[in-house]
């Protein structure tokens, strides 16, 4: 029968079948949708060493497990605020109760609307109350975005694999 030809940077393979095992694709964090957010050096999507934020003003965006867990972790070492667009969090009930009992400043239902800063460093986050014109300004040293992840199947398109509704057509 017909053979598939696969060319890599090192060699050429021929096979009767090709199995593409890539799960949901490559994952990357959902970006903060505020104009210019990518230009600020203190807008983060992951934490590598929590101790470096000790004593600094930390704000966490999101309402799921990661956001609540990070807010609780930061609270032990830094003044911490969490901003979520809904009144209720999607995190584990136990974690949400712990959050409510903690010193974390909880801002709900608010969404981030503007970053203010200079020289590539944000100093304040403006938040807007949902279904309202009410705004607040939060001083920040660091902003952590925990909006989950999105998957990408970009390589498949580049490879010329035929897709149907973001899935490989078989």
Give, region by region, the residue ranges found by the protein language model:
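FAD-binding core/adjacent interface of flavoenzyme oxidoreductases
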Residues: 1-56, 131-135, 144, 168-170
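Conserved beta-strand segments of alpha/beta enzyme cores
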Residues: 42, 79, 105-106
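C-terminal catalytic lobe of FAD-dependent flavoproteins
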Residues: 120-170
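Short, glycine/charged-enriched secondary-structure capping and boundary segments
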Residues: 32-37, 73-76, 95-99, 122, ...
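Rossmann-like dinucleotide/flavin-binding elements
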Residues: 45-92, 132-137, 148-158
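A conserved short coil-to-beta-strand element within the FAD-binding core of flavoproteins
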Residues: 1-4, 108-122
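N-terminal Rossmann-like dinucleotide/flavin-binding domain of flavoprotein oxidoreductases
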Residues: 1-12, 89-108
């Amino acid at each position: 029968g017909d053979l598939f030809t696969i060319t890599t940077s090192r060699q050429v393979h021929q096979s009767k079948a090709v199995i593409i095992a890539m799960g949901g694709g490559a994952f990357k964090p959902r970006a903060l949708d505020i104009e210019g957010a990518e230009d600020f050096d203190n807008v983060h999507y992951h934490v590598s060493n929590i101790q470096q934020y000790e004593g600094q003003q930390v704000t966490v965006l999101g309402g799921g497990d990661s956001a609540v867990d990070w807010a609780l972790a930061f609270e032990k070492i830094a003044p911490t605020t969490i901003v979520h667009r809904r009144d209720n969090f999607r995190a584990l009930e136990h974690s949400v109760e712990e959050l409510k009992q903690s010193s974390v400043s909880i801002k709900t239902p608010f969404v981030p609307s503007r970053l203010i800063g200079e020289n590539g460093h944000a100093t304040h986050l403006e938040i807007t109350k949902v279904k309202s014109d009410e705004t607040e300004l939060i001083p920040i040293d660091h902003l952590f975005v925990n909006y989950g992840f999105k998957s990408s199947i970009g390589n498949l398109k580049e490879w010329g694999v035929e897709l149907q509704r973001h899935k490989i057509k078989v």
